[in-house]
Amino acid sequence: MKVRASVKKICPECKVIRRKGVIRVICTNPKHKQRQR
């Protein structure tokens, strides 16, 4: 899980979702998981 100021989709599988006001990227590739501060 990377915590970044700006989250971006890295590959076509990545999805940007909002969960309790936190913007996250979920993906089939665990390396692509991101969360916004």
Curated annotation (Swiss-Prot):
Keywords linked to the UniProt accession: Ribonucleoprotein, Ribosomal protein
GO CC terms of this entry: cytoplasm; ribonucleoprotein complex; ribosome
A Pfam cross-reference name: Ribosomal_L36
GO molecular function: structural constituent of ribosome
Gene Ontology process terms (BP): translation
NCBIfam families: rpmJ_bact
Family stated for the protein in its record: Belongs to the bacterial ribosomal protein bL36 family.
Protein name listed in UniProt: Large ribosomal subunit protein bL36
